[in-house]
Amino acid sequence: MNPVTVFFVVVVTVAVCMILFQVYSIYLNYDNIKEFNAMHSPLEYSKMVNVTAIDRRVQDANDDIYDAKQKWRCVKFDDSYVSLSMFGYKADGVGIRRFRTLNGCIDYTFSTSTHSSILNPCIPPNDPKSRECTFLKSAL
């Protein structure tokens, strides 16, 4: 074999070994990776340090907001999902807009709704001690 062939064989061998080391490292830390993902999943749609944001479209409700409490997110409330931020809940005209699935909430919040009503149960004339207000404060 000539020196060029030996060089390329060594480079390919090193590359394959590096890939195998990475796969083995992921295998060893898989439980830690799952725990990290579970812990940081509420921040999935927030722009935070070292956390990437997932955009469902080119422009969404969180693109121009840098305060994490002001960002819209989907949270399970009772047996349904609601879209909330520190401004309140996305409303359907009468009350809080509820979704049966998390994907339905995400699709509406980050794709469908650009201008929708917002209901804040913590400001008058609403009761600041209501269940909805308490949940809103605890979710933020």
Curated annotation (Swiss-Prot):
A Pfam family matched in the record? Pox_A28
Q: Cite the entry's keywords alphabetically.
A: Disulfide bond, Fusion of virus membrane with host membrane, Late protein, Membrane, Signal-anchor, Transmembrane, Transmembrane helix, Viral envelope protein, Viral penetration into host cytoplasm, Virion, Virus entry into host cell
One of the GO BP terms on file: membrane fusion involved in viral entry into host cell
Q: Kindly provide the PTM information from the record.
A: Contains two intramolecular disulfide bonds. They are created by the viral disulfide bond formation pathway, a poxvirus-specific pathway that operates on the cytoplasmic side of the MV membranes.
Species assigned in the record: Myxoma virus (strain Lausanne)
Q: How does it sit in the membrane?
A: Single-pass type II membrane protein
**Record's subcellular location:** Virion membrane
Family note: Belongs to the poxviridae A28 protein family.
Q: Pull the Virion surface topological domain ranges from the record.
A: 22-140
GO CC terms of this entry? membrane; viral envelope; virion membrane
Chain segments annotated as transmembrane: 1-21
Free-text function comment from the UniProt entry: Envelope protein required for virus entry into host cell and for cell-cell fusion (syncytium formation).
What is the official name of this protein in its record?
Answer: Envelope protein A28 homolog
